[in-house]
Structure formats: C-alpha cells, structure tokens
Amino acid sequence: MLFDLINSFLKNGINNSNNNNNNNNNKNNFYNSLEDDDYLLNNQTTKVSLYLYFFIFAFMFLVVDLIMLYYKHRENIESRETDLSLKLNKMLIDFENDNKIKSSPTTSTTTTTITPTTTSSSQLRQPSTPKTTTKTINSPPSTPKSPPPLPSLESKLLYKDDIKQQLSLNEAKSQIDSAKQLDESLKYNSCIKLYIDGIEKLMALFSSYNSKEYRDYIDFYLKRAEYLKNELKKGTNLKSITNFNNFSKEYQINYNNKILEQQQQQQQQSSSTYRNSLNLSSSKSNSTINNRHSISSLSSLNSTTATTTTPSNTSTITSPGNKYGLQKSLSSTTLSLKKSSNSTNFQQPSPPSMVIPDIKGIDKSMVTLIMNEIMDRKNPVKWDDVVGLDKVKQSLMESVILPNLRPDVFTGLRAPPKGLLLFGPPGNGKTMIAKAVAYESKVTFFSISSSSLTSKYVGDGEKLVRALFAVATHFQPSIIFIDEIDSLLTERSSNESEASRRLKTEILVQFDGARTNGDERVLVMGATNRPEDLDDAALRRLVKRIYVGLPELETRLQIIQHLLVGQRHSLTKQQINSLAEVTQGYSGFDLAALCKDAAYEPIRRLGIGIKDLELNEISLISFKDFANSLKQIRPSVTSQSLKSFEKWNQKFGTI
C-alpha cells in the first residue's frame, strides 16, 4: 500500500513537472514568436529607410548637379557676351582709327591770294582782284535711304589671293544678311554674333577694298550691333527696341545732319579766312594810297600852282620840283574803286564746304546767296522751350513734323499742306515756334526775310525767288520760313511799283504755279501780325492758318513759373497765381519784360552800394517788386487790335 502511495506521488510529481515544462515551453515559444515578428518588422523598416535615404541623396545630387550646370551655362553665356562685347569694342576702335588714317579729306582749305600791284611814281594802279579756290563736297542725301549697299569687287584680280578674298567677302555678306533677317524677326540675341563675325571678316579686307561705300557699310552695321548690345544689356523689352527699318532711317538722318554741320563749320572757317585776307589786302592798299598822298602833299607844299578840279573829276597836282614836268593824278574812279571793292570787284566767294548744285536756268551766284540763308542748328529751340500754345503745337505736329518723319504714311488725302501761316498779335512766340519746328522736323530750314529777296538791280529779286525755291526743292524735304510775310505779299494794287509787283508774282508762281510738282516736299511757312494786308492769292496758297493768340490763364502761369526758374525769389504759389490772374491781356513778351523789371527792383533799391555786396546778400525778388513793376509794364496789345485778330480768325483761321 505504501508502495502504491509513493508510486502515485511520483507520478503526480512527474506529471506536474511535465505540465510545468510544457507551460514553460509554450511561454518560450510565444516569446520567441514575438521576437521573430519584431525582428522581421525591424528588418523591413530598415530596408525602407535605406531606400528612402538613397532616393533623397540621389535627388540632392541631381539638384546640385543641375545648379552647377546652370551656373556653368550662365558663366559661359556671360563669358561669350563679354568676348563679343570686347570684340565689338575693339572693332569700333580699329574702325575709327582706320577712318582717321585712310579717309581722304573732303574739303581743301580755302586760300585767298592777293597779288601785289607794282605802282610807278606817276600812277597808282588798281589792285588785282583776289582769287579764291574752293572745293565742293557732295550734298547729303535729301531723303532717308536704306544703308549703303556693299560695294562690288573690282573686275581685275591683281593678286593671287583675290579669289580667297572674294570668298571671304561673300561669306561676310551672307552672315550679315542672315543677321539682318534675324534682326527683322526680333531675334536680337542670335543676330549680334552674326553681325560681329561678318563685320570682323569685312574689316580684315579693309586694305583691299577701302572706299567710302565700304566704310559706310561697316559703320552702319557696327552701329546697329552696338545699339542692340547696349539695349539687351539694359534689359529693354524686345518690342521697345527700335526695329531695323526705323534704325536705318534714323541713322541716315543723323548722317545727313552730321555732314551738314561739318559743312557749316567749314563754311564759317573759310569765310573768316577770306575776311582776314581781304582785310590784309585793304590795309596794304590803304597804306599804298597813304604813301601816295604823302608824296603828293609834300610836293604840294612847294607847289605854286593851286589844285584844280576838272569836269572828269580828276585832281591834278603839278610840282615844280619835278624835273620832267610829269603830273601825278589820282582819278576819282581809282579812289572809289578802293571804297567799293568789297561790293563790286571782290564778290563773296561761294562757301567752299557747301556744294553748289547745277540747277537748270539758275545762276550759281544766286544759289550761293540762298544757301547762306540755311538756318544753323547750333542753338536749337525744342518743343519744351515753347511754354503753352498746346493747340498750336498739336496742329504743327500734325501738319509739319509728323509728315517729315513718316512720309510714307502722309500720302494722298493725308498729304501735308504746302503753305502755313502763323498770325496773331506780336510777342507771342510765332518766330520761336518756327525755330522749334526747324529743330524737331529734322529738315533743311531756310529763314528768309524781305532783305534776302530784294536787290538794287532790276530783275535780281525775281531771280533770287526762283533760286530759293529751286534750292529748297533740291534739298527737300525743306521748310521756307518767311518772317513778316506781309512785307512781301501785301495786297496788289495799281499804285505799287513795277518791281514789287513782279516780285510778288514770282513768289506766287513758284509757290504753287504751273511748274510746281505735287510730289515736292517743300513747305512755305509765314508769320505775320497783319494778316488782313495779305494778298488773296497768297491766302489761297497758305492753306493752314493758325492763330497764335494771347496766353490764357494757365499759359500765363506756366510762363511766369518758367521765367522764375533759377531766380532767387520769395513768391509763394498763391502769389504766382495772383500774378497770372492780374496779367490778363499781357503777351508772352510783356510777361518776360514784367519779370525782368521785377528782378531789377532789388538792385534799384541798393543803387551804387551793390558793388560792395555779395551775390547772396542781394534781397530776394518779392511780390511787392512785381506790384511796382505792374505799374510800369503795361500790355502792348490793344483791345481793338485783339478784336480784329479774333474777327479775322473766325473768318479765315483754322483753329
């Protein structure tokens, strides 16, 4: 029985131990399974992280590589642009140097030679007429043209490498033509390099094909390439860059103006040289006459015979000391020759730097006189200098300036008028507006007065009128401005002289007669303050009649403000407005006189004491000074004349 009890105890213990082991094994298996799952999860997370890091690093390397490529490309572009800019600047410098060395002078210096006359002891001979030698240059083209064509090669090949030069020339021309096509298509970045490459090849052939046309061709495209480079460097919008055709027209206009300025400078130099030589001749002649007079006076001191005057106006001086009884005579003709040598024998030479065109039926001396009336543009008057007169400026812009800048647009019914009249009370800027038109329109401008077309010789006035219109037609587009036109084209009557009548008739015929052509670009602009005195035929030809009246309130305010610019004054804005209101009826000239008189008021108060004062110690111009000046400076235009102008404007005026 004990044995059975022990045996059952052992069995129970073994079973319990087995159960415990099973439980432990189950627990261990559970934990092992959990550990296996975490391990797998950790392995998968690690793999995903590695792939993610790999893609991130690859993307970063790609971005860095792209950035490096961008900056490298940008550096290459900047380097190429720098090289092109340096190459272009070098070509410009070389081209200017070649022009200075190889270009032949266009004019030769005018020299005036005076041959000294040998005089005997008995007779004073007439001085010889001065001889002048002049050379002329070709006149600038009258209308803007396209750039000069590439000059053709010589027919004879003088060197072995002429074929290579011809191929190089053709290649350069092909590159420039391609660049021109890109230029017209607004592909400016691409055309600059082709321009530079083509010009570089042309400049390499300078020694073989050096001519004016060749230089002009290179100069035009050099200027175009330089202009495009500067505009692109500034970041200008492509549509705002001047296109090829407009640039060509502007280049030709500037080229013509440059030649005209050079001609005027050379004309002034030659005229001064001629005057100096003429004065030298006169001084020599006068010294010779004085010597003869001194000899005659010394002889007359011992003379016992009085001086007698004969009907032939010859003064005879007899000297008893003369061994052979010779008479020393000075005729009045010889003496008058000395006085009138400037007007008769010594004719004004033609300007050597201005070409004298060969015009059928026109004397060259008349043409020379007319060409001296071409206005000089050294001191130009611009639109901004003309204060107020907005309606007048707008009308002139439409009638004069725009048609000359775009002649292709203003054709047919848009063709500009051939005659224009500025009328109104004096002192309101009619002449100043004409000067502004002369500068802004960029055309040949003739400033004519009545003295320019009158002569003491019968028939010369009509010849001068004919020469004026012929020269203006030759240099068209051009403007003929006649100040105080009423002095030339007053109403014809039976009481006037025959010469005046012929002169008016010739002006009207040349203005718009049977020989005139509708395609001529010659505008006649007149200014007057007596429009009622003009002839009816002249009014018919002066189609556009613009009234330049007294300044209005706003214009008077602008004029006063413009005159006070740069002056030391204490006027407030309200006081300036008050001045503009109280000056109703004042012309532009009256306002200028008023401001000048007011500026003198502080100096009047100082008197002689101003010599000891500094400039900044002089008192400022005050409103009180203007009040004192208003008592002295009155309007110069009467109300009656103003009413007559307004009445004439309502009847015949345009605006």
Swiss-Prot record:
It holds the Pfam family Vps4_C. Belongs to the AAA ATPase family. Spastin subfamily. GO terms for biological process: microtubule severing; nuclear envelope organization; positive regulation of microtubule depolymerization; protein hexamerization. The keyword Nucleotide-binding applies. The keyword rRNA processing does not apply. It is a peripheral membrane protein. Its EC number is 5.6.1.1. Residues 102-151, 261-325 are annotated as: Disordered. Residues 169-232 form the MIT domain. Residues 141-151 have a biased composition (Pro residues). It is an enzyme of class 5 (isomerase). It comes from Dictyostelium discoideum (Social amoeba). Residues 102-140, 262-320 have a biased composition (Low complexity). GO terms for cellular component: centrosome; cytoplasm; microtubule; microtubule cytoskeleton; mitotic spindle pole; nuclear outer membrane; spindle midzone. This is Spastin. ATP binds at G424, P425, P426, G427, N428, G429, K430, T431. Gene3D superfamilies: 1.10.8.60, P-loop containing nucleotide triphosphate hydrolases, Phosphotransferase system, lactose/cellobiose-type IIA subunit. One of its GO terms (molecular function) is tubulin binding. ATP-dependent microtubule severing protein. Microtubule severing may promote reorganization of cellular microtubule arrays and the release of microtubules from the microtubule organizing center following nucleation.
